[in-house]
């Protein structure tokens, strides 16, 4: 279901009524939605997600420094700055920006796991999580890289 977990929870009973053994599949949107695991209609559903392992460390340090939890998508900005620093450290000011380095087939390590840019799109190594009994469980871990 390519929508929020809230919308999927509303639609789930209709889907299950027509086909009780259907496994619901969700998108990464569900990972950013607090309380999605508490929706009993979604029990057993799978959804793609970035790994939260490094994000939890980042969030703990952020909370310690600023006294509040970071917005979940702040990891994208964090990774963007780190990527710019990585590519820019060998860049001579005044020379053209080495944008070809953004297309490194091996990708880059980020807070949300490996990512790379292909065909002008961001590609991420995602894990699969299952909503199970009010929590989420990783059923297939994210790859640690792109073929390295």
What feature does the model see in each segment?
Residues 5-78, 91-92, 142:
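Extracellular/periplasmic periplasmic-binding protein-like sensory domains
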Residues 134-148:
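Short, low-complexity, Pro/Ser/Thr/Gly-rich segments in the mature regions of secreted, periplasmic
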């Amino acid at each position: 279901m390519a929508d929020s977990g809230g919308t999927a929870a509303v639609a789930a009973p209709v889907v299950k009524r027509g086909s009780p053994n259907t496994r619901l599949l969700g998108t990464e949107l569900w990972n950013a939605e607090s309380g999605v695991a508490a929706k009993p209609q979604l029990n057993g559903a799978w959804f793609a997600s970035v790994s939260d392992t490094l994000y939890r460390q980042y969030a703990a340090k952020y909370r310690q420094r600023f006294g509040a939890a970071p917005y979940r998508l702040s990891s994208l900005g964090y990774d963007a700055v780190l990527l710019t620093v990585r590519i820019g450290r060998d860049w001579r000011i005044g020379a053209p920006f080495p944008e070809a380095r953004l297309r490194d087939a091996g990708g880059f390590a980020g807070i949300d796991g490996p990512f790379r840019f292909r065909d002008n799109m961001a590609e991420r190594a995602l894990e699969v999580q299952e909503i199970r009994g009010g929590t989420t469980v990783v059923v297939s871990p994210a790859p640690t890289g792109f073929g390295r």
